[in-house]
Amino acid sequence: MIKGIYQSARSLLAANKNMERISSNLANLNTVGFKREGLFSEILKSAGQSEVRSSVDASQGDIYETSNPLDFAITGEGLFTVKTTNGYEFTRKGNFRISDDGFLVDENGNPVVGKGGEINLQEYLNGEQSDIKVSAKGEISINDFHAADLLIVKVDDYERRKMGLNFSSTQDINDLAMETEFSVRQGYLEESNVNPMVELENMINVSKDYETAYKMVTYLDSSLEKTNDLGRI
């Protein structure tokens, strides 16, 4: 009976974590480049336990046009690299801008990293006359002068590296492996790959799982209490 309570409690924990992930996915439905997270329960029949593991859906989100020359979308594999106070982070969010001192930065002001380090375009800019072009391979040119190359990196372990809206940091640029199977599209952004209908369906199913597990815990706890009462007679 104690074992049954323990297993049901684990199911409650799994349902809670599932609901947290579903809520996060729905909250980021309109977040550029967001990759949905999910939890699945693998039933270990031999041990009679439920193991909860996290997963990241790295599938391509829909691409939409913005006509902003500083918006970039990656089709295929790979992530942009940005330099934060925590080190290098990787992201599919390509809504960039140019800072007052000429750096290409993300929406939080973090410098975008190229193959030669942080990308600074100051010396190539000529006010409103600056014609910024980015090739499919991430080569940045301004007024036909080559200025920098975006560092598009490869990440194999999405689950381990997931950290908030980006993927986790590393302090050493040499840890980064360059991706080759990608294409950069200028003037486009990638939508979140969250499907709201799927998430709502998951929410209903998880709610049912939680209710079932809660009823089982309540039943077993009541049965245990009755057994203890009989033992006192």
Can you say where each PLM-predicted feature lies in the sequence?
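Amphipathic alpha-helical polymerization modules
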Residues: 1-233
